[in-house]
C-alpha cells in the first residue's frame, strides 16, 4: 500500500530553482517524480541558467537503445539513488516507481547505486532509421543516415536540459554513402566514408555559432586513399583513416599525410575515445589500452584487476571520455537467470599518469545500470554538459 503524499508548504519557484541548481543533475530524474511542478522545474531552461551562473554544470551520460527492429530508438540517462542503503525499501514512497521497472539481482561487483532511466521526451518522434550522433555542450546532434532507403541531409539535435528535439538547417548536399560526424572547435564535420567516396563532396561542416554550412576542401589526389573507414579529432586536428591516413588542419586549412604519431591500426569510434590528449581503446585482447605517441605503441591501462571481464565481441562495448575519466559500458547475459534478458554494465574509471609509459585506472563505481530483453540493440552512448 502506497503512503499518502506529503503536504508541503508552498515554496516560491525562485527559491526552489536556487535549491535545485545546487543538487547534482544525477538526482533530477528522481526529483521529477515528486510532482508535476517539480517535473516542470527540473526541465526548465531557467534552472540550467542558474546552474551555469553558480558554476554547477556537470557531465551527464545518455544511452540510446532500440528495443526491436520496428520500434523507435529510446534514450536513457544515468540516475543515482538518493540513498546509500544496501537494502532500499521499494515501497517507501514517491521515488519507488523509478526503480521497480529496472530492478535486478545484485551481484558482488555492483554497488547498485547507479541506473539508467528513460528520458521523458515531449516531441522526440523519430521514424525507424539508423542514427549517428555527436555531442556539443548540452546538445546531442543526430543525423538520419537512412530515410526510406536513401541517405538524408536532415540534421536534428536533442536539448538535454529540456529533452526536446529541434531541427537545424539541412546540409547543402546530401551524402551518397555512409558517413561519420565529428565536432572540432565549435563546428560539426560530416564526412563521407566507405569505398570510393565522392571527394568533390567529402566533408561539410556546420558552424554552431552562425548556424550555417560550409564546404571543406578535400585532400589532393596524391595523398588521398580509395576508402575511409574511421575518423578522429585529436590535438585540434581531424584525422581520416583508411588505406591511407590523412589529417586536416583547420587553422591552416590544409591536408597532410599522417606520420607515425598516430597508431597504424584504428578502432571504431564507439570503442575508442580521447581523454586529455591520450587515445584510449578496447580491442580483441579484451582489455583497455592507451596509445603512447612517444613510443608509438599501445600499452595496457593498469590497475583494473577488479573490473569485471568484458565481452569478446567489441560491438557489445562502448567507450567514452567523461570529465577527464573513461567510462566503459557493456552488455552481459544474465547468468543462470532468464535467457531472454541481458544486463547493461557501466564503470567509471579515474586516470592517473604515473610515468611516461604507465597510466593507471581506478574504478570509481561499477554497476548494473539496466536489465533489458536480449533482442534490444545498443546504439549510442554519449556525454553532455548541463
From Swiss-Prot:
InterPro entries from the UniProt entry: F-box/kelch-repeat_ARATH, F-box_dom, Kelch-typ_b-propeller
Keywords annotated in UniProt: Kelch repeat, Repeat
Superkingdom in the source lineage: Eukaryota
Kelch repeat spans: 187-236, 238-285, 287-324
Pfam families xrefs: F-box, Kelch_FKB95
Domain F-box: start-end pairs: 5-51
Protein name, as recorded: Putative F-box/kelch-repeat protein At4g11750
Amino acid at each position: 500500500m502506497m503512503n499518502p503524499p506529503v503536504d508541503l508548504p508552498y515554496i516560491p519557484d525562485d527559491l526552489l530553482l536556487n535549491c535545485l541548481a545546487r543538487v547534482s543533475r544525477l538526482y533530477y530524474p528522481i526529483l521529477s517524480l515528486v510532482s508535476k511542478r517539480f517535473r516542470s522545474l527540473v526541465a526548465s531552461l531557467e534552472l540550467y541558467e542558474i546552474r551555469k551562473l553558480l558554476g554547477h554544470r556537470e557531465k551527464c551520460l545518455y544511452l540510446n537503445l532500440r528495443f526491436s527492429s520496428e520500434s523507435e530508438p529510446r534514450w536513457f540517462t544515468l540516475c543515482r539513488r538518493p540513498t546509500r542503503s544496501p537494502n532500499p525499501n521499494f515501497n517507501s514512497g514517491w521515488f519507488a516507481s523509478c526503480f521497480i521497472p529496472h530492478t535486478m539481482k545484485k551481484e558482488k561487483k555492483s554497488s547498485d547505486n547507479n541506473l539508467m532511466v528513460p528520458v521523458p521526451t515531449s516531441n522526440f518522434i523519430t521514424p525507424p532509421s539508423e542514427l549517428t550522433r555527436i555531442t556539443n555542450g548540452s546538445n546531442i546532434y543526430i543525423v538520419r543516415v537512412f530515410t526510406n532507403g536513401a541517405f538524408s541531409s536532415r540534421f536534428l539535435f536533442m536539448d538535454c536540459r529540456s529533452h526536446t528535439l529541434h531541427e537545424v538547417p539541412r546540409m547543402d548536399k546530401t551524402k551518397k554513402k555512409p558517413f561519420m560526424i565529428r565536432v572540432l572547435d565549435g563546428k560539426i564535420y560530416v564526412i563521407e566514408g566507405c569505398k570510393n567516396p565522392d571527394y568533390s563532396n567529402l566533408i561539410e561542416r556546420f558552424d554552431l555559432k552562425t548556424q550555417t554550412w560550409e564546404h571543406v576542401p578535400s585532400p589532393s589526389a596524391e595523398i588521398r586513399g580509395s576508402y575511409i573507414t574511421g575518423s578522429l579529432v585529436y590535438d585540434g586536428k581531424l584525422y581520416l583513416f583508411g588505406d591511407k591516413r590523412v589529417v586536416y588542419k583547420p587553422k591552416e586549412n590544409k591536408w597532410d599525410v599522417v606520420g607515425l604519431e598516430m597508431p597504424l591500426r584504428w578502432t571504431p569510434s564507439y570503442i575508442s575515445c580521447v581523454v586529455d590528449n591520450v587515445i584510449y581503446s578496447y580491442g580483441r585482447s579484451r582489455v583497455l589500452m592507451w596509445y603512447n605517441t612517444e613510443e608509438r605503441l599501445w600499452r595496457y591501462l593498469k590497475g583494473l584487476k577488479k573490473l569485471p571481464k568484458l565481452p569478446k565481441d567489441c560491438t557489445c562495448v562502448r567507450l567514452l571520455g567523461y570529465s577527464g575519466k573513461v567510462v566503459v559500458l557493456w552488455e552481459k547475459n544474465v547468468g543462470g537467470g532468464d535467457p531472454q534478458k541481458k544486463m547493461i554494465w557501466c564503470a567509471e574509471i579515474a586516470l592517473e599518469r604515473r610515468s611516461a609509459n604507465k597510466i593507471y585506472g581506478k574504478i570509481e563505481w561499477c554497476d548494473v545500470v539496466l536489465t533489458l530483453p536480449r533482442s534490444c540493440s545498443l546504439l549510442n552512448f554519449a556525454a553532455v554538459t548541463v
